[in-house]
Structures are given as C-alpha cells and as structure tokens.
Amino acid sequence: MRVAGRITDAALASHDGRIVFVGPTAECDWLISPAPSATVIDATGCAVVPGFVDAHTHVVFAGDRRHELARRLAGATYAEISAEGGGILSTVRATRAATVDELVDVTRPRLDEMLRAGTTTAEAKSGYGLTLESELTMLRAIRRLDQEHPIDLAPTFMGAHEVPAEYRDRREAYVAHVINDMIPEVAREGLAEWCDVFCERGVFTPEESLSILEAGQNAGLKPRIHANELGPTGGASVAARLHARSADHLVFVDDEEAAALADAGVVATLLPAAAFYLKLGRFAPARRLIDLDVPVALATDVNPGGGFSPSLPFVMSLACFAMGLTLEEALIGTTINAAFALDRSEDVGSLEVGKRCDAVVVNGPAIELLRAGVSAIRAVVKNGRQAA
C-alpha cells in the first residue's frame, strides 16, 4: 500500500473495542450518541493515526547486555564481544535460567515502553533458549503476556536463531533437533503462529533455513526470515521461494532478489534502528524496494544487544531521514503494511469501521512523530480504551 487516506475535522467512535464510525465530525454528531460512561478524548489540533504495529521484536529475554554497548562504542566488534562470552549466547545463558513468571516480569516494562511509544500490536520471538524446554518457556511467557498486557502479541518460534554452544561442532544435529523435536512440540501446544530463521553467514545457511521453514510450514507455522542483514547471504531468495510473508533486515539485497520478493508477494520488513545501533554504515535500500513494488514495513528489532529503542516513531524518523521514505510511507510501514506482515491487516493497521479501535493521538500534526528524542504522543488507545 502506498497511499494513506486523510480526513480533516474528523471523529472516531468505537463500541466494544471496534470502530463504529470514522469520518467528518459533523456526520458523527448526528449519527453517534455517546453513552454517559463513554470516554471522550479531545483531539483538537491533533493527528490521529492507527495504532502502530511492530512486526519484528526480540522483546522477551532475560539478562542484561547494556555493558556491551560501551565496548562497541570503544571499537570492539561483535565477534570480539562474543569471544569474551557476550553476544546472543550471553542472553541464552540468562534466558535458560529463567522461569515463565520471571520472563513475564522482566518483559512487561519493555512492553509498557512500547505502548507509550504508540505500539498496540507486536510480533514477539523466541530464540534465546535454544533448547526444547527453554524455547517452550519463552513461548509460554509470550502467551501469558499476550493475555495480560494491552499490546496484542503475534508469537514466533525462532529456535533457529543461533547454534548453541553445545552443538557448535555438530550443527547438523541441531538443525535436526529444531526440525524433529522443537517444531512438532511448538505446533502441538499451539504456541506460535510463525517460524523464523536467522539466515546469515556463520549462522544458518540458505539450505538449512529452507529445511527448517518448510518443516514449520508442514506443521502449520507460517514462514518469515532474517535475511541479508550482514551480507548477501541468500535469505531473500529463500523468502521468495517459500512465498514467506516477510523477509526482514535486507540491508544487502539486490534488484534481482527484490524483484523476486515482489513477484512472491513478500513484505520487506526493514529495521533501520538495528543498522543504526550496529553501526553497519548502510541501511536497507528502502526507496529502491518501494520502486520495485515490494511492500515495505518498518519494525524496531528491539532486543538485548543491538536494538535499544522500543520506539516506532524513532524508526520512522530513521526511515525518513536515512532511508529516503516520505512521512506517509513511514506511517504505512508502521501500520497497515506491518499488520499485513503479521497477517493481521483485516483486524488492525488502519482506522476502518469494524476493525479494532487502536489509535495514536499525536500532539500536533503527524510530522511531529519524526522529532526523535521527544514524545509527540498525547494518548494511545487500545481496543477503544485509553491505554497510555
């Protein structure tokens, strides 16, 4: 989608969490009679946009790697930090030691931050357990949080996030473990909608990624993939071959791969904050992807190591000023396209009658959202109720 509708002097009304009216205020005044108990938000002078949809997060984890940021700023590489015991495997150790209750408790404040920044729906991945039981623990925590927190969560199984240390010299056995043990149990318990793989040099090859995602598809888990983040590693081609709903990162994607993504109907979910914090020196070619008719979504990639911001407005600012998107394209990327990337566009992502009443009230015109470092959000509405 490329064009966002706009109504001036507008009103929005909901009942039982669903939008029942959106249109000119004059029409609302004679069509809708608010109940005495109704909450009324005066948005005079404000833009009201759909609640943001964050289509790629690693928000559930235990442990703390903020100290690695200082090492990185001092010039240490990710490989050097990993060799010192840091990186993903540091988070794995902490997450394996955590219970469902502990993961819920440490994640809830992160979701609160996301909500205050306007996010009302988000994807949440496992992938810091890397054993059957700890991956299930993460997904059970995600299910609990989805039930208890205002943000709706789309659960993704990502046992193929990294090869754990105990399998380092027998990676084929770990791939088989993911396919033969993890995926069937995740599907049996109904803990995930999606299956994701980190297809990257030194992690999972395109062939391994294809096998894992096909196994997920056969078990009822829809495919998405981390692709071409650190180099041209073939993940985008895997996404196109499988008609995956989303290929994420795509910092190193060429025109041939982009055309294949467009032909296959794959959403390019771009994560400019990840490229920014990892100091990659380049961003995904968002403008080129849009010109080649690839639908573009934007997400935070909030995670313990290289995604320190839970704010989609910050991501929008990067997308506009570092990747060449217009404000309208950035809004579409964080709303309806992101909802489509999560297979939720029939329910959220736009302000339409019948959809969930998820909305963000901006303290001024929508361009205020691009003011990085300050919050331009006056109110966040989730299911028709003010949630932040």
Residue ranges and their predicted role:
Residues 89-108, 112, 120-233:
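Metal-coordinating catalytic core of metallo-dependent amide/deamination hydrolases
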Residues 12, 17, 45, 56, ...:
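Divalent metal-coordination and catalytic microenvironments
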Residues 222-223, 232-347, 362-369, 386-388:
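Active-site-adjacent C-terminal substructures of enzyme catalytic domains
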Residues 1-34:
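N-terminal metal-binding scaffold of metallo-dependent hydrolase/deaminase domains
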Residues 1-3, 334-336, 353-388:
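C-terminal cap of metal-dependent C-N hydrolases
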Residues 35, 39-106:
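Metal-associated gating/positioning segment near the N- to mid-region
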